[in-house]
């Protein structure tokens, strides 16, 4: 299918699925830290911690900085061609990979670990954002080319975080005996049993069967999790030209050896990050703390810390020890054995890619803002940092209920259902349910009494203040009882609000942090992915609510 026809079909199908969309400013949702809010509002307190503003001008400045850096483009293309030998790449992906040889081609990147079956919805949203931003930049700057990239954090060893998925409100956990780097783990019978469970949950619909078949095709026995994740992401986003980078590669690690050696011999990254943390922590909570050496050693599936000793270096958990000369020789001979942690992971990414923008969640932005000096000391360009897009998917039935109850968008983010119920009852009751005016009048009377008593005996003041406080508490109890009595008249609406909130904010958390794409793919199929891409901002403007058609 040619690209113009594909694009036209995507737009038509998206219009069928999406009834309407609106946005809420991120700070109003209550789900984002003060650091993220300040970054989005260009607060000057954060200006020292990043290089380029999250804007088109910032992108242009990042492009100029990237042009001065010797990105290993040919080696990158060769490594990607090798990685894609096992996948039937689309013509657009092939063209995008080959274009990376050209000095006027840049990447827009998001990074994430290989969560089981793609994990939470924001995994999908992050990748869709890279596609939307790349598309926008290609339109605005046709003299250059921008390629969307998903950079897979396959060396992460936190199986507790990555080895489960929530589908249909049920948490499915991969009960494997494997340990170490999750991307290097193999699909086993325990994992296949989860696919069987998912089939029982969603296999009754045409799109549900399609999703299960995709899982079965991607996750076959003996295949690495990294390879399976590449295949499923390729199936979802390949038509958009998304390039998946698997950095756990000897070819790509060999491009990073100079930084690895510098870290081993000088510990430069920790020195840089500690001063930044000191400055940043004056105003904000620190997201990531560095170590003396911010590298792990990979052996098989094991990923363990490297520690410097008087005699050289040790990887205690693996029983390994090196002199300085031995470890430097090992870096040259076996670069794939060295795995950067959170402090150096971004430096590796920006070393091998011609990248100009990085898209991440609030937590990711928080630790990237600690890294500006690390990048400077490594002499690697620092990209534009962009907060990923966020979505709340509102089914047609729930949207209609909200409309009938006149509950506005911002109220949805107030948290607990009880807060929204109280607000709804107060807004719809024909009675006055608050006695603030009366309480203020009584407080004024106590103030007069206190002044009168103080003129007679100052020791009476404390007693009168205690009486005033006690009276205020009793009146608040009366107000609560009035509200409870009125709420009993709205039992049906209370039940509706509770069900709405349970669906839109499962477990009291954001939908995108809990649910998996399977819950929506089973209804809309591939149109779901298309709709997310089409409704993704380039430079994130707010938390997007998508009102869905049946």
Segments and roles (model prediction):
Residues 103-138, 360:
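N-terminal catalytic cores of NTP/NDP-binding nucleotidyl/phosphoryl-transfer enzymes
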């Amino acid at each position: 299918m040619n690209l113009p026809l594909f694009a036209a079909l995507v737009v038509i199908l998206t219009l069928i699925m999406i009834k309407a969309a609106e946005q809420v400013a991120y700070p109003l949702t209550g789900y984002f830290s003060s650091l993220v809010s300040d970054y989005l509002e260009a607060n000057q307190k954060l200006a020292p911690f990043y290089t380029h503003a999250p804007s088109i001008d910032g992108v242009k400045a990042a492009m100029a900085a990237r042009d001065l850096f010797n990105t290993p483009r040919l080696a990158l293309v060769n490594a990607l061609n090798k990685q894609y030998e096992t996948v039937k790449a689309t013509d657009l992906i092939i063209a995008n990979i080959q274009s990376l040889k050209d000095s006027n081609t840049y990447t827009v990147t998001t990074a994430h670990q290989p969560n089981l079956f793609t994990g939470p919805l924001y995994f999908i949203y992050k990748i869709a954002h890279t596609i939307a931003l790349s598309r926008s930049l290609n339109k605005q700057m046709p003299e250059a080319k921008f390629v969307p990239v998903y950079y897979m954090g396959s060396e992460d060893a936190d199986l507790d975080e990555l080895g489960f998925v929530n589908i249909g409100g049920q948490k499915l956990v991969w009960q494997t005996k494997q340990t170490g780097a999750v991307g290097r783990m193999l699909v086993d019978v325990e994992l296949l049993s989860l696919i069987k469970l998912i089939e029982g949950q969603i296999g009754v619909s045409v799109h549900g069967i399609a999703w299960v078949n995709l899982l079965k095709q991607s996750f076959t026995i003996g295949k690495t999790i990294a390879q399976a994740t590449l295949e499923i992401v390729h199936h979802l986003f390949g038509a958009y030209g998304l390039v998946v980078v698997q950095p756990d590669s000897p070819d790509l690690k060999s491009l990073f050896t100079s930084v690895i050696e510098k870290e081993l011999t000088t510990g430069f990254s920790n020195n840089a990050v500690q001063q930044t943390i000191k400055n940043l922590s004056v105003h904000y909570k620190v997201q990531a703390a560095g170590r003396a050496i911010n590298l792990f050693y990979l052996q098989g599936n094991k990923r363990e810390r490297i520690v410097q000793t008087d005699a050289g270096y040790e990887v205690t958990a693996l029983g390994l020890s090196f002199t300085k000369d031995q470890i430097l020789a090992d870096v040259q001979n076996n670069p794939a054995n060295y795995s950067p942690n959170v402090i150096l992971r971004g430096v590796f990414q920006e070393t091998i890619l011609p990248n100009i923008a990085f898209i991440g969640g609030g937590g990711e932005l928080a630790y990237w803002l600690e890294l500006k000096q690390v990048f400077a000391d490594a002499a690697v360009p620092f990209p534009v940092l962009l907060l990923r897009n966020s979505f709340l998917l509102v089914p047609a039935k729930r949207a209609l209920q909200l409309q009938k109850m006149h509950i506005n968008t911002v109220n949805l983010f107030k948290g607990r259902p009880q807060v929204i119920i109280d607000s709804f009852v107060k807004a719809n009751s024909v009675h006055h349910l608050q006695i603030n005016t009366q309480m203020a009048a009584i407080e004024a009377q106590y103030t007069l009494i206190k002044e009168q008593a103080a003129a007679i005996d100052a020791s009476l003041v404390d007693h009168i203040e205690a009486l005033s406080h006690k009276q205020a508490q009793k009146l608040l109890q009366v107000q609560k009882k009035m509200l409870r009595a009125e709420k009993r008249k709205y039992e049906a609406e209370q039940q509706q609000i509770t069900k709405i909130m349970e669906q839109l904010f499962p477990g009291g958390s954001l939908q995108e942090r809990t649910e998996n794409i399977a819950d929506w793919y089973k209804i809309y199929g591939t149109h779901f992915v298309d709709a997310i891409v089409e409704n993704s901002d380039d430079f994130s403007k707010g938390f997007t609510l998508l009102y869905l058609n049946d």
